Amino acid sequence: MFTIALPKGALLRDSISTFKRAGLDFSNALDENNRSLTFESNCKRAKALLVRNGDVPVYVSYGQADLGIVGYDVLRESELKVAKLLDLGFGGCHMSLAVKKNSNYSKPTDLPANCKVASKFIKTARSYFEELNIPVEIVHLTGSVELGPITGMAEAIVDLVATGKTLKENGLIKIDDLFYSTARLIGNPLSMRLDDNHLRDTILSIESTNSLIEE
């Protein structure tokens, strides 16, 4: 039996559908009355751990899970050593730079030197501004980063944007996209090397069923 780390939240339903098409059914994890954090597939070939999206790479990297599904945004921010296996295509959103709508900033280089930029993704934000050679101070927030510009604490934010509704409702606009993030299938490198084809068969099954959906 191998172990899979499933992300709580927005990616969970599509993650469960992905494994179900590959023959591993963890649908009981969707039962809101079920408080369990571990689930066996109906076929008893695999076990799932229900964890926070940001913790998926940790469980996979440390070997507590052989496979996992996580957003590319989290994967890129974590910088943990995992095998990057498949782009699953769902959960799409942009990592974006946004400012107040009534500001004078229309592109990244308009931002004043050493200004404050609020973000949950501090490594991603820092790397982005370093590549642009723009000196800024990254302010780490774990909640609603939109409050940074609203309160005047920050000139801009770096955050995930799906529909743009939250930005619009808070008087913010995008001025740049850093990258497009989708759900990714990842694996533990050692588990992949020691695999007796159970993981490989699952990965190939996911890849083939995903291709059929895209067609």
Swiss-Prot record:
Read off the SUPFAM superfamilies from this record: Periplasmic binding protein-like II
Give the highest taxon in the source lineage: Bacteria
Q: Which CDD domains match?
A: PBP2_HisGs
Query: Where does the protein end up?
Result: Cytoplasm
> Is Oxidoreductase included in the keywords of this UniProt record?
no
Gene Ontology BP annotations: L-histidine biosynthetic process
A molecular function GO annotation: ATP phosphoribosyltransferase activity
Its pathway is: Amino-acid biosynthesis; L-histidine biosynthesis; L-histidine from 5-phospho-alpha-D-ribose 1-diphosphate: step 1/9
Enzyme superclass (EC): transferase
Name a single GO cellular component: cytoplasm
Return the EC number.
Answer: 2.4.2.17
Reaction equation(s) it catalyzes: 1-(5-phospho-beta-D-ribosyl)-ATP + diphosphate = 5-phospho-alpha-D-ribose 1-diphosphate + ATP
Which Pfam families does the annotation name? HisG (PF01634)
Q: Carries keyword Glycosyltransferase?
A: yes
* Keywords, ordered alphabetically: Amino-acid biosynthesis, ATP-binding, Cytoplasm, Glycosyltransferase, Histidine biosynthesis, Nucleotide-binding, Transferase
UniProt family annotation = Belongs to the ATP phosphoribosyltransferase family. Short subfamily.
Alphabetized HAMAP family for the sequence: HisG_Short
Q: Report the NCBIfam families cross-referenced here.
A: hisG (TIGR00070)
Kindly give the PANTHER family that the UniProt entry links to this protein: ATP PHOSPHORIBOSYLTRANSFERASE, ATP PHOSPHORIBOSYLTRANSFERASE ATP-PRTASE
Q: What is known of its domains?
A: Lacks the C-terminal regulatory region which is replaced by HisZ.
Described by its record, this protein's role is as follows: Catalyzes the condensation of ATP and 5-phosphoribose 1-diphosphate to form N'-(5'-phosphoribosyl)-ATP (PR-ATP). Has a crucial role in the pathway because the rate of histidine biosynthesis seems to be controlled primarily by regulation of HisG enzymatic activity.
Subunit structure and binding partners: Heteromultimer composed of HisG and HisZ subunits.
Protein name, UniProt field: ATP phosphoribosyltransferase
Native organism is: Prochlorococcus marinus (strain MIT 9215)
